[in-house]
Amino acid sequence: MNLLERVDHWGTVAPNKIAHVSGERTLSYGELRARSNALAAYLSGQVGDECAPIAMLGHREPEMLVAFLGAVKSGRAYVPIDTALPQQRIDNILAIARPALVLTAQETARVSAQGSETPLRPVQKNDPFYILFTSGSTGEPKGVIITRGCLEHFLNWMLGEQKFAERTETFLNQAPFSFDLSVMDLYCSLATGGTLFSISRDLVENPKLLYRALTNSNVTTWVSTPSFAQMCLIEETFREPMLPHVRRFLFCGETLPPQTVARLRERFPRAEVWNMYGPTEATVATTSIRIDDDVLKKYSPLPVGRPMPGVQVVIVDLAGEVLPPEQRGEIVIAGQNVSPGYLGRPDLTGQAFFEFEGERAYRTGDQGRLRDGLLFFEGRIDHQIKLSGYRIELGDIETNLLSLPQVRDAVVLPVTKNGAVLSLAAFVVLSAREQASDFVVGQALRKLLGQRLPVYMLPRKFLFLDAFPMTPNGKVDRARLAASL
């Protein structure tokens, strides 16, 4: 069965099974099947043969799922747009996407309540399934096209590797639907007859309500960014009694610190912890590894794993030549999970995508190296700076800070003036709050770092926070931190 057939299968054999929980609202598989079919019929009637995508403006409402499936059942890709985005950003996305129709949760609820027997013409394997917008270096968002074939290749790998139990799993949905990490929990859940448990931004902003919701969630598969888990670990009761059924933690989207894994394994001893890596352009995740005690002891920083079957990951130099193991270069991904390119931007597509050994390939802009058959992610190429003539990897300093037992989390940023880098600043979340002044603690950390790094890589300023600000996608908001310098 293909993905849409899998989801509709649960609507037939288990129509009362809950597919989605968002706050006080639920959506069953039977309702999802009937309403998405009705919406698909409506879209076919309204839009006709036009193949432009359907934009869906919302947050975590059940109607989002109805809209996604309704769009692809009508033969059109969907563009999820979270209402938390600034209006200017939403306007930019709509201008680039040029959707045939923009749906809201209210409109979707109204239209999908009307039954229909219209034959469906769903998207085919090579057709766009969804389009996600990511940040562009020019400030203009880029629409990444993911086909049904890309998504199903990713999904088949996930289902085979993780062995999710049918009809008994509850997946945590932390990331907004406009962020590709959500694709992991959304479609792994729908394909296996699971329940998707959404965490709204209101819960994230109110820890008391968040932990109450988690206690009542019955989550078995936790999917989030590492930053979100680190925020939860601040709460002392975030332990196995709060999530007694959790079987696995799946992390993607950011670097996973070893300290975070160690704390999770101590608090949730029966759960597995997985580290995964992949850009939006390669359909959510391309590599994975289970972080057991042996991996935790052997590697720091942690590896992001081995590639999925049917996909190659190679490291190339500036000339595009493949490098041998252990050498650092740009990560290139080639295979069936790679996007056909950016919506309406053949120029950007030509720069980032190419053919490698007969497969579509993508230049990630990420640095890494291969060691022991494992991929190690070593930060963005554009996170390199020059200070006093020295080329510095900010991620290198962060990794060394995170290796200190006093440090729970760390971000290092350049202090600039008129475009020139003057010095470095380290934002730090301490493992335990010190009695000494921030100045004294900062000097102590600088001294410890000085035992590991050359003097030109040592931050001049240390700023201490209880927790880092996060973007709507659940990643550390580096822009907000930089604005405070």
Predicted features and spans:
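Alpha-helical elements of Rossmann-like donor-binding domains used by nucleotide-donor carbohydrate transfer enzymes
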Residues: 6-9, 31, 38, 42, ...
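Structural motif
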Residues: 55-57, 101-103, 223, 250, ...
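Motif- and composition-driven signal specific to adenylation
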Residues: 63-69, 76-92, 117-322, 330-339, ...
